[in-house]
Amino acid sequence: MSNNQPVDIYGKPYNRTLLVVVLLIGTFCTVLNQTLLTTAFPTLMKAFDISASDVQWLTTGFLLVNGIMIPITAWLINKFSSRNLYLSAMTIFLIGTITCFTAPNFSTLLIGRLIQACGVGVSMPLLQNIMLSIFPPEKRGSAMGMSGIVIGLAPALGPTLSGYIIDNYHWRDLFGMVLPIVVLVLVLAFFLMKSVIPLSNPSIDILSAILSTIGFGSLLYGFSSVGDDGWGSLKVIGFLVVGVIFIALFSWRQLHLEHPFLELRVFKSSTFTIAAVLAGVTNMAMVGAEMVVPLYIQNIRGESAFHS
């Protein structure tokens, strides 16, 4: 056996190139779904007779669950083998995609999207951790560059691809086209994916996970209800207040835990804080435009989905 042949945590050799290919294809499919539905919003509003504030939950709910899963994944990566975790994440994503593809109503479609988000929330940070584990330090820059291209390219293609499919086929085909690729990735991963990240026995703070879910979920629901109910609505005010309270409790708990669910002390660094704020503002602008522009172009100007 060559000295350069990589081995997993059990000392068994594996093909690093094939493993990376499987990871990147799977990541492309999962990340593509983040922006795949925005162009289809007007079509889905007509299909299910729902408002814009309702249909936007297909994206905001997806991003919320995705965000909640990322810190949980840090615990999962150290607790379970990377092979089993990747197979589980892609299986969950497949179940969510099938649920969306067969959804008879909007509620089922939303549930499918949230299931998809659980899989994506695990697979994305897992990809980055695996890349750092299987490449030596001098090659990690190139490896992260490859994953960055996929993570950046997939969301950029999503709206255009969605517009073409909506104009020429059925909205269900947005999920139908992904199904065979995900199945192929699962089959390849079963044979090619290896356990490459050393395991430990970490603990997770369940209360922090609950506080963050309720806090960010309430805040997001409150803001999303403004379009229908207005800023003076007791429902809107109530959810916003609950969200702020739970987020404050969550933040206080993180600052007093020895091993926090989410490390907030990094915000002591002004450089990190500025970068985080800029990234947040940029993301808000991008996601906001991705949701509003298709509605304006299609519903107000009467243009096609592909044009929007």
Language model feature labels by segment:
Residues 2-191:
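Transmembrane-helix bundle of Major Facilitator Superfamily
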Residues 95-103, 169, 191-195, 226-230, ...:
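Helix-loop junctions at the membrane-solvent interface of multi-pass transporters
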Residues 17-32, 37-41, 48-61, 72-74, ...:
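12-transmembrane solute porter fold
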